Curated annotation (Swiss-Prot):
Database matches in InterPro entries: Cystine-knot_cytokine, Glyco_hormone
Organism: Hypophthalmichthys molitrix
Family per similarity comment: Belongs to the glycoprotein hormones subunit alpha family.
Transmembrane regions listed in the UniProt entry: none
Protein name, per record: Glycoprotein hormones alpha chain
Amino acid sequence: MFWTRYAGASILLFLMLIHLGQVYPRNDITNFGCEECKLKENNIFSKPGAPVYQCMGCCFSRAYPTPLRSKKTMLVPKNITSEATCCVAKEVKRVLVNDVKLVNHTDCHCSTCYYHKS
């Protein structure tokens, strides 16, 4: 009787895992909850007939061990080196909305994160 409970629970867990695998078949877990880098309308500054767009979304980032020869040249040696790209505007157009000068993004791409540089 004790073993049948374990077998029943194991089978139930196995069936739930199979169901989850079918519900979320080919989702990339690394981007889960974050859309690709693209233009989206800014609801705060947009008005009917004059939409304002901005770049939003995710790009890649990664971390890896710092190569020894690079570590030797660092003022403050770090064990981990990281790279990241951010969703930035490739092209922009300046617009005036309610006497406020704005930059309307017209094209987006993944590029260097400027706020990470020091």
